[in-house]
Amino acid sequence: FLGDSGIGKTETAKYISSCLGTDMVRIQFSMQQTNSAYQYIFGADHGEDSLARELIRRSSNVILLDEFDKVSPSFYNAFYQMFDEGTFVDANYSVDVSKCIIICTTNYRTEEEAEKYLGTPIYSRFSKVIIFNPINVDDKLRIARKCYERLIAQVNAEDKALIENNSILSFFERVIKEG
């Protein structure tokens, strides 16, 4: 998924996972710049959390590689194997991900920009590229209304009292319009 930050790429991945009725494993690469992140991806000592253990435990059908444009090229080999062979291998486990939907999000706006910065070897492994266009004010308002309606429904389903208050929605609308 290509497009500006905040336009719904991650939410779309969550929605896909929800529609499939499965868990989603999310790796947010903006936070994966440390040695502990490297150990998480490629396998820590037995007993510690790792991506492979999480994939095994959750048997997820959706893997979200969020903000993939921020990944260190040192991680690419693991993803070549994942994309090419449908297998994720770390220091301790081998996990079949051939039936998983693997979604990468980036803040690149065009295919050319993504290929230039990610490099052809990794970019050519994506089977489909979807570009998210910038969201206009009307779209933001529509999204805010849907989120508000979802919140009301969720609270009502939990038998908690929430007074529907149009001033809340008006506040959201004002923030969106004024920035």
Language model: regions and residue ranges:
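Hydrophobic positions in the central parallel beta-sheet of the AAA+
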Residues: 27, 63-64, 102
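AAA+/P-loop NTPase substrate/partner-engagement loops
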Residues: 19-46
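Short basic/glycine-enriched coil/helix segment immediately N-terminal to the Walker B
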Residues: 52-61
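Walker A/P-loop
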Residues: 1-27
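Conserved AAA+ ATPase small/helical "lid" subdomain
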Residues: 130-136, 140, 144, 154-179
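Switch/connector loops and helix/strand junctions flanking conserved nucleotide-binding motifs
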Residues: 8-10, 34-38, 110-114, 138-142
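Canonical AAA+ ATPase core
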Residues: 47-51, 67-78, 83-139, 150-151
